[in-house]
Swiss-Prot record:
It comes from Polynucleobacter asymbioticus (strain DSM 18221 / CIP 109841 / QLW-P1DMWA-1) (Polynucleobacter necessarius subsp. asymbioticus). It comes from the Bacteria. Residues 394-515 are annotated as: Regulatory domain. This is 2-isopropylmalate synthase. HAMAP family: LeuA_type1. Homodimer. Belongs to the alpha-IPM synthase/homocitrate synthase family. LeuA type 1 subfamily. The keyword Cytoplasm applies. Catalyzes the condensation of the acetyl group of acetyl-CoA with 3-methyl-2-oxobutanoate (2-ketoisovalerate) to form 3-carboxy-3-hydroxy-4-methylpentanoate (2-isopropylmalate). The gene is leuA.
Length: 515
């Protein structure tokens, strides 16, 4: 019988550490529900001690998720661990994930602790955590660059104290597959009680080898949990990509002889949702979930595919959730058809009032474009969810005038708090003028780091999806807006980013937050 690999998703925690990828509580819940549909084993919902916003988000995810284990990260101290346990109270199944650095560099420079002090703190923290939860994971931060003898002592000690999962991260993406696999194997061989815990790998993609290293940790090292994120989202060059791990295990079962419980048909919906919420566009040639992942332009390849798909395809697009039937609804589609399509997309709308509001947005969009695609529906629901969160800034309307040879002018009307305000401004273009008009009133003083436009679907009728990245006071946030009118989408995106800057609960603790 094939061994099972546990899929531990950390999109909501480590993925959120990408600059600008901060998510609201409701956004985290929406992604968590999709991860549950994906049948992820463990969902790391955040770092409870890092901010009040993260604490509330973890609590909301814990209450919403029924089947997956919900996990919170914590530093290896009583205060953080207590905070994690409190946030997870509503979870059907919960895990506390405590981490502590074990490499010589981190111990000396960051922790300023001796190896013996680190060993004792690791033991105390796991002993304390076991009083609050039965499922405890310990991560040796920067584990791959740790000294083998010392790491063996730490791991043996925390297993004795009750750690049920041992995670050995390649925190800085320094490892190579064979060496990392051998490193895990050596640890498991030398730690006397290694059979008392599940071994886990957590790799970063700084050298482009996160997926390969993780698979080597499983195949060579004997690990049985892989920590990963949707789209490989994560700080610096990202994390291990969940979709690549899952499809590698499935496609090369002959080699790995392992299974996972993931419903692969939910991979693309998860990818699209994470991309839309965070504003991080998936590159077209990204494995499994990129727009070109199953595209064949070579005439020879196309001929082979038509004769037999196995000539150039090692997996089916539909197996990972790509749908050949793109056009789903139109202007004449009714409320029941809209509701049914939401269910097919895995989107849950609990209140009738929320469904009615979303359907009103759908009909308004259908008046502007003749064909409504799944991506349009996802964007509609994102706008609806944002409105439900009680935004401080909310777009109402805009008008703009531009003429060749003259500076464009724009007038934007939006809600700020409980007041409706309007402002006019000029700019180098209609988008610049609109954002200047908003800033005339908002006076945020934020620095704009990025402005990008992406067509949600094909054709000139497509909605534009705009991402605006702002920075202020050391915080970086992304705002996303969608509309057939690119100028309106830009204004929505800017206001979305301002909402995140305005929310004090989103300010994170200035501390190392990743194994």
């Amino acid at each position: 019988m094939s061994d099972k690999v546990i899929i531990f998703d950390t999109t909501l925690r480590d993925g959120e550490q990408s600059p600008g990828a901060s998510m609201t509580k409701d956004e985290k819940v929406r992604i968590a529900r999709q991860l549950e549909r994906l049948k992820v084993d463990v969902i790391e919902a955040g770092f409870a001690a890092s901010s009040e916003g993260d604490f509330q988000a973890i609590s909301a995810v814990a209450a919403a998720v029924k089947d997956s284990i919900v996990c919170s990260l914590a530093r290896a101290n009583d205060k953080d661990i207590t905070r994690a346990a409190d946030a997870l109270q509503a979870a059907n199944a919960k895990r506390i994930h405590a981490f502590l650095a074990t490499s010589p560099l981190h111990m000396a420079v960051k922790l300023r602790m001796s190896p013996e002090e680190v060993l004792e703190q690791a033991k105390r923290s796991i002993r304390f955590a076991r009083n609050l939860a039965s499922d405890i994971e310990f991560s040796a931060e920067d584990g791959y660059r740790s000294e083998m003898d010392f790491l063996c002592r730490v791991v043996e000690a925390v297993i004795n104290e009750g750690a049920s999962t041992i995670n050995i991260p390649d925190t800085v993406g320094y490892a190579t597959p064979e060496l990392y696999g051998d490193f895990i194997k050596t640890l498991r061989t030398r730690v006397p009680n290694s059979d008392k815990a599940v071994w886990s790998v957590h790799c970063h993609n700084d050298l482009g080898m996160a997926v390969a290293n993780s698979l080597a940790g499983v195949k060579i090292g004997g690990a049985r949990q892989i920590e990963c994120t949707i789209n490989g989202l994560g700080e610096r060059a990202g994390n291990t990509a969940l979709e690549e791990i899952v499809m590698a295990l499935r496609t090369r079962k002959d080699y790995f002889d392992m299974v996972c419980g993931i419903d692969a048909s939910q991979i693309v919906p998860a990818s699209k949702l994470v991309s839309q919420i965070t504003g991080f566009v998936v590159q077209p040639n990204k494995a499994v979930v990129g727009a070109n992942a199953f595209a064949h332009t070579s005439g020879i390849h196309q001929d082979g595919i038509l004769k037999n798909r196995d000539t150039y395809e090692i997996m089916r697009a539909e197996d990972v959730g790509w749908s050949a039937n793109k056009i789903v609804l139109g202007k004449l589609s009714g409320r029941n058809a809209f509701k049914q399509r939401l269910q097919e997309l895995g989107i849950t709308v609990e209140a009738e009032a929320d469904l009615n509001e979303a359907f009103t947005r759908f009909k308004a969009l259908a008046d502007q474009k003749s064909e409504i695609f799944d991506e349009d529906i996802i964007a509609i629901m994102s706008d609806s969810a944002a409105a439900e969160e009680g935004e401080h800034y909310h777009f109402i309307s805009l008008s703009q005038h531009s003429e060749t040879g003259e500076r464009p002018k724009s007038r934007v009307i939006f809600r700020m708090g409980d007041k409706e305000v309007s402002s006019e401004a000029e700019g180098n273009g209609p988008v610049d003028a609109s954002l200047n008009a908003i800033e005339e009133i908002a006076k945020s003083g934020a620095e704009q780091l990025l402005y990008s436009v992406n067509a949600i679907t094909s054709g000139t009728q497509s909605q534009g999806e705009v991402t605006v990245r702002l920075s202020k006071g050391g915080r970086i946030v992304n705002g996303v807006g969608t509309d057939p009118d690119i100028i309106a989408a830009s204004a929505k995106a800017y206001l979305s980013a301002l909402n995140k800057l305005h929310d004090p609960s989103q300010a994170k603790l200035n501390a190392q937050m990743a194994p």
